[in-house]
Amino acid sequence: TTLADADRMVVATEKNNTLLSVDHTRHWYPLWHRCREMIEDGAIGEPRSVLLVFHSSRSMLFRNGTHMVDTVLWFAGSAPTAVYALAEGGFADYGPRFASDGGHESDTDPAMSMLVELDNGARAFVNTCKTIPQVFDLEIFGTNGMVRVNEDDATVTTTNGNELLERRLPRPQFTSTNLAGCMAEMVDLINTGGNPSVDGNTARQVLEVLLASLQSQNAGNARIELPINDA
């Protein structure tokens, strides 16, 4: 998998006037959308740090890792500019290019810890591990508070002088989510027009971060500036 592969997909769909929607599924989770809207509306001030933890036997960089990186970039609302990364033990010689079996066997694709610099000055941290019981937790820290969200629960903490006020968000009512939400959006776009929640260029940005993390791991965890050259 290379950026050139992604570019060919984007060009082909644009040339043929075809919708390309990428299944980064949390874009169709109503509770996660509500949290993102609150951040956009300034509920916690300016986002300065995003922390995502995902532990699972399937914490593979090019499987669930794609969703994790998409999530932090989405919530940060900013483009990545540099990446530092450290792979799990046993992958010291992995990289600088994708070399797994396409997301099937976990021993071919590393879990990764990475720090992503963003062009608004914020930082995003993604930490994944295959040997810890399943945990999925996202925290967004802003200048006036924080949002914490997992699969089906979310809290917002804001400052009031020296006091911290925490409240749990109600779960929105919905008729479709996950992949079904993605498909419902596609049908609506075909009928009425518009742009997908996750188009090819958005997904390409995620791929670039993943590939940069492999280059960082291969270069002794060095800082890799974007855009990268993965030819």
Task: Show where each model-derived region lies.
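Aromatic/hydrophobic pocket-lining residues that form π-stacking "cages" and hydrophobic walls in ligand
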Residues: M9, C35, A212-S213
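Rossmann-like dinucleotide-binding domain that binds NAD(P)(H)
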Residues: R48-R123, N127-P133, N201
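NAD(P)-dinucleotide binding in Rossmann-like oxidoreductases
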Residues: H104-D109, D119-A184, D199, I228
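Rossmann-like NAD(P)H-binding beta-loop-alpha module
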Residues: N16, P30-S49
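Beta-strand-loop-alpha-helix segment that lines the small-molecule cofactor/substrate pocket
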Residues: T1-H27
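Residue-level signal for alpha-helix termini/capping positions
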Residues: E14, E40-A43, G77, N191, ...
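C-terminal helical cap and adjacent loop that interface with cofactors, partners, or active-site loops
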Residues: L165-A231
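Short, hinge-like loop/turn segments at secondary-structure boundaries
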Residues: V11-N16, E37-D41, T66-V69, A99-D101
